[in-house]
Amino acid sequence: MNFDMDLFNQVAKSALEYYGWQDKDEAKLIVLSENATYMVKNKETGNNDGVLRIGRPGYHTLSELNSEMKWLKQINEYTPLIVANPMKGLNGEYIQNVKGPDGEVYNCVITEFLKGSSPDENDEEQMVKQFKYLGETTAYLHRQTEIWNGTSKIDRFEWSFDNVIGKTPKWGDWRSFPDMTPEAQTFLEDVVQIIEKRLKRYGKTGNNFGLIHADLRLANLLIEGEQIKVIDFDDCGFGWHLQDLASALSFIESKPIVPKLVNAWLSGYKKILPFTDTDFEEIDTFIMMRRLQLTAWLGSHQQSGPVAELSVGWMEGTMDLAERFKRLFG
């Protein structure tokens, strides 16, 4: 996946005009992933006025983006959670269609800036405490989508097995990871088959499947005191609830602290929603599936800032997880 940074910087500058901010603000790139994300800073005060997200053409339809905005509004109005509110442009719309210098139309949205910092994965005591709040936060999201009559009208992608690590993977093919060996691929193919069989047996019900955030990793959480704020709903879609637990463990799945984090997450989740023995039995399935999904993401996002650092030792950690998974369920 290639990003033309000069092009995206020009689109970001143009996007500010749609909000009437071109004179007082400037956009500075902070993250490259599925989208380009910019901090919108006031030129005089240096304050953060918002966060601009520029989508790659074709990644989301306008209908999908409007559905995301609808869900954010529901979360803010009907749950105790804090999420970043989208801001309307001069035309009264949340989504701005900005024409780039290449002639393509880029969907842009600015959300409010939320204070806070991402969890520090090196502070284990705090991590365990925060995962308890994260479990509770996740359960509020799941409960809201279960009772919201508008959920069925939401137009969002489905994070099915095929769309995650199967025949039509949205983030790319895990087999294309640069350090993948023929031996590792053969072993992981067996693991993928086990995952598919277990998911078919687990099934999709109103209690285990629905509208989810789908990318509740540490980078998309902000901590301020004991309050967890959730950002970046760009990948929200329909999936298994356990995918939100697995995504919270993104890039740290092989660390020794994971069992403590899972237990903390469960203790928070169960305060709001029930969690069955059947759900518990599939936690490892979803963690393994997420790990393979991230393997695909790392392979297909070589331009993203943190990829080089994250890729160090990735295959070793992945194979350790896979071998354990196969011992348990193979």
Residue ranges and their predicted role:
Residues 1-26:
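Juxta-kinase regulatory segment immediately upstream of eukaryotic protein kinase catalytic domains
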Residues 19-41:
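ATP-binding glycine-rich phosphate-binding loop
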Residues 90, 121-183, 209:
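A cross-family kinase active-site recognition segment
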Residues 241-274, 290-306:
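Active-site activation/catalytic loop segments of kinase-like enzymes and analogous catalytic loops
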Residues 294-330:
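ATP/Mg2+ or Mg2+-diphosphate-binding catalytic cores
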Residues 102-117:
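Conserved short submotifs of the Hanks-type protein kinase catalytic core
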Residues 54-103, 122, 126-132:
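A conserved alpha-helical element in kinase catalytic cores
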Residues 33-51, 86, 196-242:
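Active-site acidic catalytic loop and adjacent metal/ATP-binding pocket
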